[in-house]
């Protein structure tokens, strides 16, 4: 079957009008897992119908699936709270994109989705979002001590900032920063480090050898699932570490120092009978007055287009909980070696890379083994040749590590993952317990959950009858839309677009009315005659809608979708609209993780348009849970992006102070630009010039570490 471009466009628009439009608002409120499962089901239907030469049916299934991928799922509520499901979304999107014969169809659906979203956001009658409960603020609960009054990071932006927003802003296509000079990221001096120099340069261009990658590809690995109780605790082990042995890692390094680093051999694990708690010690770094060596400030060379990988690796290495999980070899307690042999263990590659970075401060290395493993596990990323999105890569890594380390032993070391007090959290006990047990069984448990997993509660409350619907979700990364200026809510032009505003907008109450309102079951009019008329009218619908109904009914997850809306006849819809059906959607944090990762959504659908709005973000961030408890975080790392995704560059900034302290004369902020490193000092770049926040139009991903109240008092007093 051959269709010209006009025919394809007309078909895509017809499918939207018949099969998507009337359900779009309701689908945005549905469970993300159900939406992903249905999109995968539609892809399987597409493949099946191709085999039996039902070309129109196959084309229709593909179009509907593309609408799920580019319209429904990205605009769904739970998509902003990204967890290990995001990796499934990325793989599914790759499956659709690999159907090259359907490339033009996919592009048309993607372009139409962009138009639909623009139109949807422009309609103010159906959606009204208000910030009644501010969940985030940057100022401490008490005045700062005198010596704490000077905190800042170099601010590259000197222009005037904006007013506080209350709406979303759409990215624009800014090409002013597209011309990135790649040579600036390479050598600027020989392999030496001058004493007292603020900038450290690593390696020579000759050392940037392009690794040879393996061609092996692995299939999709299922997540760990368990229905049984955890086994009893295993005997405690001890690790015998031999030091002063030359490392045999495959990663290559270039030295900046004449001092030979101590190396560590793969430790032997022996079972012993002891009731003492297991001690997991870090490798030993030789005593040195060199700050680069002491704090493991290590550069990562860029063989081609891996700056997005290098930047995330530096932030992960700067995440103490994550880094020490590998450096102490504790990760081995949870690694399922039967399911994941050494040849496909991303965990082991991270361990080798982190050990190399930890013991080689003052040098730069090429992370060959890690890149090879990523290439093997995800050949679609085309590492190292293609530029990718850094936060997507982060989620891919976290999801893979979660799979490899999902193990029954996890609960013995992280009991917080299976213990909760619904009353203390102030959640709906029955709804939360049901969701929690189902979520744990489905996704398994891993140390990644302990480090990164947060929980959200979403409530839909009908304003006509008072009925409420509760749903819960987890996240590893908070993906926040960037607000736009409000010219009518605030008059002070000195107010800034702050990170706190993005969070407060995310948790702000949203009023849904008309077609956008929640289909409240208590308010649904059950008129038998209308139902009969609806059944009759459905039989007369086009074959396209009939196909979509069949594909939906055959999906094992069809109950997640629009069966509420399909019960309403035109007559019922008029009655409901006459009564002004209105819903208030509210969102609350109920559990926040030790490490809070925030992604600012700067890119649009085609990934070439970028929102370059200046965002101000604090060194200390306070977030209020639903139960009123304040969780305090301190910033320790950011990933910044210049240019656009196709022609751009990633760098990272990390506080390399061992405890991420940010008091006077304590913080050690370092900028990592591949193998080019800049250490910021207090007498340069205004690092401690009296500010407690930073502003940037390039900040993209932020890493915050939770502070205990005791540590807060010790650090700043």
Swiss-Prot record:
Instruction: Give the enzyme class.
Output: hydrolase
Please report the name of this protein according to its UniProt entry: Ubiquitin carboxyl-terminal hydrolase 11
User: Compositionally biased, Low complexity: which spans?
Assistant: 242-257
Which family does this protein fall into? Belongs to the peptidase C19 family.
The entry lists its GO molecular-function terms as: cysteine-type deubiquitinase activity
> What PROSITE patterns does this protein's entry cite?
USP_1, USP_2, USP_3
Q: Which UniProt keywords apply?
A: Hydrolase, Protease, Thiol protease, Ubl conjugation pathway
Active site feature:
307 (nucleophile), 649 (proton acceptor)
Q: Where along the chain is composition biased (Basic residues)?
A: 549-564
A GO cellular-component term linked to this record: nucleus
**Residue intervals of the USP domain:** 298-707
Quote the PANTHER family the UniProt record gives: UBIQUITIN CARBOXYL-TERMINAL HYDROLASE
* Keyword Protease applies: yes
Q: In terms of domain of life, where is this protein from?
A: Eukaryota
Annotated spans, Disordered:
231-268, 531-577
Q: Which InterPro entries match?
A: Papain-like_cys_pep_sf (IPR038765), Peptidase_C19_UCH (IPR001394), Ub_carboxyl-term_hydrolase (IPR050185), USP_CS (IPR018200), USP_dom (IPR028889)
User: What chemistry does it catalyse, as a reaction equation?
Assistant: Thiol-dependent hydrolysis of ester, thioester, amide, peptide and isopeptide bonds formed by the C-terminal Gly of ubiquitin (a 76-residue protein attached to proteins as an intracellular targeting signal)
Matching entries from Gene3D superfamilies are given as: Cysteine proteinases
Instruction: Point to the regions of Basic and acidic residues compositional bias.
Output: 258-268
Which E.C. number(s) belong to this protein? 3.4.19.12
* Any one GO biological process: regulation of protein stability
């Amino acid at each position: 079957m051959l269709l010209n471009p006009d025919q394809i466009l007309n078909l895509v628009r017809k499918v939207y009008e018949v099969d998507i439009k009337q359900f779009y608002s309701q689908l945005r409120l549905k469970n993300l897992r159900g939406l992903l499962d249905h999109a995968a089901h539609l892809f399987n239907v597409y493949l099946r119908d191709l085999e039996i030469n039902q070309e129109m049916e196959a084309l229709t299934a593909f179009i509907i699936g593309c609408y799920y991928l580019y319209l429904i799922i990205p605009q769904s509520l739970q998509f902003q709270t990204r967890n290990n499901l995001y990796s499934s979304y990325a793989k599914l999107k790759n499956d659709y994109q690999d159907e090259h014969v359907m490339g033009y169809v996919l592009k048309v659906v993607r372009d139409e989705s962009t138009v639909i979203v623009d139109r949807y956001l422009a309609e103010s009658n159906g959606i009204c979002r208000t910030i009644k409960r501010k969940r985030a603020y940057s100022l401490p609960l008490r005045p700062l001590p005198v010596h704490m009054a000077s905190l800042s990071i170099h601010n590259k932006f000197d222009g005037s900032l904006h007013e506080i927003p209350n709406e979303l802003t759409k990215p624009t296509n800014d090409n002013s920063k597209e011309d990135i000079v790649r040579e600036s990221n390479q050598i600027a001096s020989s392999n030496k480090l001058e004493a007292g120099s603020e900038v450290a340069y690593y390696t020579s261009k000759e050392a940037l050898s392009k690794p040879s990658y393996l061609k092996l590809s692995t299939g999709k690995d299922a997540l760990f699932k368990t229905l049984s109780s955890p086994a009893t605790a295993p005997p405690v082990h001890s690790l015998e570490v031999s030091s002063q042995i030359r490392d045999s890692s495959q990663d290559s390094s270039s030295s900046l120092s004449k001092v030979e680093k101590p190396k560590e051999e793969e430790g032997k694990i022996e079972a012993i009978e002891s009731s003492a708690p297991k001690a997991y010690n870090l490798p030993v770094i030789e005593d040195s007055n060199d700050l680069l060596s002491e704090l493991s400030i290590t550069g990562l060379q860029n063989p081609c287009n891996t700056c997005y990988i290098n930047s995330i690796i530096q932030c992960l290495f700067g995440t103490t909980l994550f880094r020490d999980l590998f450096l102490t070899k504790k990760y081995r307690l949870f690694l399922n070696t039967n399911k994941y042999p050494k040849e496909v263990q991303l965990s082991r590659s991270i361990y080798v890379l982190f050990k190399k970075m930890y013991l080689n401060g003052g040098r730069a290395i090429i992370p060959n083994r890690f890149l090879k493993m990523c290439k093997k596990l995800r050949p679609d990323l085309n590492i190292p040749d293609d530029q990718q999105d850094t936060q997507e890569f982060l989620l891919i890594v976290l999801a893979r590590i979660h799979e490899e380390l999902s193990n029954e032993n996890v609960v013995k070391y992280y009991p917080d993952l299976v213990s909760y007090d619904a009353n203390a959290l102030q959640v709906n006990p029955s709804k939360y317990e049901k969701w929690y047990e189902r979520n744990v069984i489905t996704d398994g448990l891993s140390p990644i959950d302990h480090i990164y997993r947060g929980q959200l509660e979403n409530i839909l409350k009908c304003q006509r009858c008072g009925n409420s619907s509760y749903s819960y979700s987890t996240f590893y990364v908070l993906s926040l839309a960037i607000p736009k200026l409000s010219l009518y809510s605030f008059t002070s032009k000195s107010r800034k677009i702050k990170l706190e505003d993005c969070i407060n907008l995310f948790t702000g109450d949203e009023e849904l009315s008309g077609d956008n309102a929640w289909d409240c079951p208590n308010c649904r009019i059950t008129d038998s005659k209308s139902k009969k008329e609806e059944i009759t009218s459905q039989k007369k619908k086009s074959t396209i809608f009939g196909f979509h109904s069949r594909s939906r009914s055959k999906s094992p997850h069809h109950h997640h979708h629009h069966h509420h809306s399909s019960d309403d006849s035109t007559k019922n819809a008029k009655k409901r609209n006459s009564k002004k059906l209105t819903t208030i959607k509210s969102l609350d944090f109920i559990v926040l993780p030790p490490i809070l990762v925030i992604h600012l959504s700067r890119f649009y659908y085609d990934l070439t348009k970028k929102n370059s709005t200046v965002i101000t973000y604090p060194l200390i961030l306070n977030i209020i849970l639903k139960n009123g408890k304040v969780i305090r975080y301190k910033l320790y790392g950011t990933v910044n992006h210049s240019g656009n995704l196709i022609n751009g560059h990633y760098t990272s900034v990390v506080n390399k102070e061992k405890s991420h302290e940010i008091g006077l004369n304590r913080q050690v902020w370092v900028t990592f630009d591949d193998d080019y490193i800049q250490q910021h000092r207090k007498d340069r770049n205004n690092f401690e010039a009296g500010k407690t926040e930073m502003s940037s139009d390039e900040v993209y991903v932020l890493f915050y570490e939770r502070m205990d109240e005791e540590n807060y008092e010790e650090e700043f007093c």
